[in-house]
């Protein structure tokens, strides 16, 4: 090539070479970003799967202890699980799930305790109120007086009302239970015979340990 031709075409070739190198770098960057994005998606999926497996694992462990009749061991393990969670929201969910497991094995005293723990972590946890209502309704007796045992249903109604106030998704179920358990309240006559009237406070003793207002 003549010197004039080199001067004429040389710079264009250099430019094309630099352009190809630049485009190669951009395409390589895009490829790297795509690979990185894929890794992030995969990592996110792995994390979610691991979290789900961990949750299922602790519930399985809890269930095994309960199947063996080791309620105390299940409670201790449940408390240990709560200590491992670093967030109040996470603790609330786990406490509720533990309460469900305990309730299914008829460990209602311990189940109620974990419901209250869930509410201590999240006062707006409607499901915990709903479960408390179910536990109280399933085990209302704490005295030999029938009318006083029926006062437990005031507590049931209070928790059902609170549950639907906090969680709209629980409204239908709560209303159905409200209609059912409102029929189990003591009559005014029965309460009057025991010296109680509307507006009086009654302490629900036994395993419950809560107070209600007669209305």
Predicted regions and their residues:
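Terminal, low-structured helical/coil segments at or just beyond the last alpha-helical repeat
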Residues: 165-215
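Generic helix N-cap/helix-start motif at coil->alpha-helix transitions
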Residues: 36-41, 45, 49-60, 87-95, ...
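TPR/TPR-like (Sel1-like) alpha-helical repeat modules
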Residues: 120, 148-170, 179
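Bacterial Sec-dependent N-terminal signal peptides
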Residues: 1-41
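Short coil/turn linking the two alpha-helices of tandem helical-hairpin repeats
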Residues: 100-106, 133, 138-148, 179, ...
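Residue-level recognition of tetratricopeptide repeat
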Residues: 88-91, 125, 170-171
């Amino acid at each position: 090539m003549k010197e004039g031709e080199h001067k004429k075409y040389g710079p264009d070739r250099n430019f094309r070479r630099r352009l190809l190198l630049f485009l190669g770098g951009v395409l390589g960057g895009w490829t790297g970003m795509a690979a990185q994005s894929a890794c992030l998606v995969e990592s996110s999926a792995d994390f979610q799967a691991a979290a789900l497996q961990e949750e299922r694992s602790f519930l399985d462990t809890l269930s095994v202890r309960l199947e063996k009749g080791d309620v105390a061991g299940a409670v201790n393990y449940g408390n240990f699980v709560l200590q491992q969670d670093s967030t109040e929201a996470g603790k609330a969910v786990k406490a509720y799930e533990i309460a469900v497991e305990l309730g299914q094995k008829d460990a209602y005293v311990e189940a109620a305790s974990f419901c209250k723990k869930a509410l201590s972590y999240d006062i707006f946890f409607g499901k915990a109120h709903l479960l408390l209502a179910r536990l109280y309704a399933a085990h209302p007796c704490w005295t030999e007086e029938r009318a006083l045992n029926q006062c437990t249903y005031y507590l049931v109604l209070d928790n059902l009302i609170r549950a639907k106030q906090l969680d709209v998704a629980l409204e239908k179920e709560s209303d159905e239970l409200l209609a059912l358990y409102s029929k189990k309240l003591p009559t005014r006559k029965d309460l009057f015979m025991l010296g109680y009237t509307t507006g009086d406070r009654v302490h629900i003793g036994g395993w419950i340990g809560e107070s209600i207002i007669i209305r």
